[in-house]
């Protein structure tokens, strides 16, 4: 990814950039991630669409893992978990927060999840 390979972009800035679409979606109660919506009906999707949805999530996981590895190497992040495991936690928590926020109309849910995740990087 260009952001993780660009030495002028900090890992924290890349992570904040990653959060932006989630925050944009979370500002209203009527939007969620399209792939999260499709994943909810994954088995009913045609095989080609299943592959694309899986690719979307796998690309996001790989990108987050790159950001976390970069941040750890540069001393921006301090965590003991495997970067791959944290990437899964981030994607799962962000996607879940969008869905729960939509159902509960609690629009602080996503911001609370993002704060909790970023605090995790300082442990």
Give the positions of each predicted feature.
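Structural signal for well-ordered, non-membrane alpha-helices
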Residues: 1, 23, 61, 65-69, ...
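Short amphipathic alpha-helical interaction patches enriched in hydrophobic/aromatic residues
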Residues: 1-4, 43, 98-101
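Hydrophobic alpha-helical connector segments
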Residues: 2-31, 83-90
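Amphipathic alpha-helical segments used for helix-helix packing
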Residues: 13-14, 28-48
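Conserved protein kinase catalytic domain
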Residues: 19, 36-39, 114, 118
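Amphipathic alpha-helical interaction elements
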Residues: 24-27, 41, 99-102
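Hydrophobic/aromatic-rich alpha-helical bundle segments in the mid-to-C-terminal region
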Residues: 48-59, 72-118
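Generic C-terminal helix-cap and adjacent flexible tail
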Residues: 119-123
């Amino acid at each position: 990814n260009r952001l993780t390979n660009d030495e002028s972009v900090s890992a924290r800035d890349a992570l904040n950039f990653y959060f932006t679409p989630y925050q944009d979606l979370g500002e209203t109660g009527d939007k969620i991630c399209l792939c999260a919506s499709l994943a909810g009906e994954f088995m009913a999707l045609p095989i080609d669409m299943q592959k694309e949805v899986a690719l979307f999530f796998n690309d996001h996981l790989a990108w987050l893992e790159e950001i976390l590895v970069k941040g750890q190497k540069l001393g921006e992040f301090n965590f003991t978990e495997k970067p791959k495991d944290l990437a899964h936690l981030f994607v799962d928590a962000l996607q879940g927060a969008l869905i729960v926020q939509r159902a509960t109309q609690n629009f602080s849910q996503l911001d609370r999840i993002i704060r909790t995740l970023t605090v995790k990087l300082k442990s």
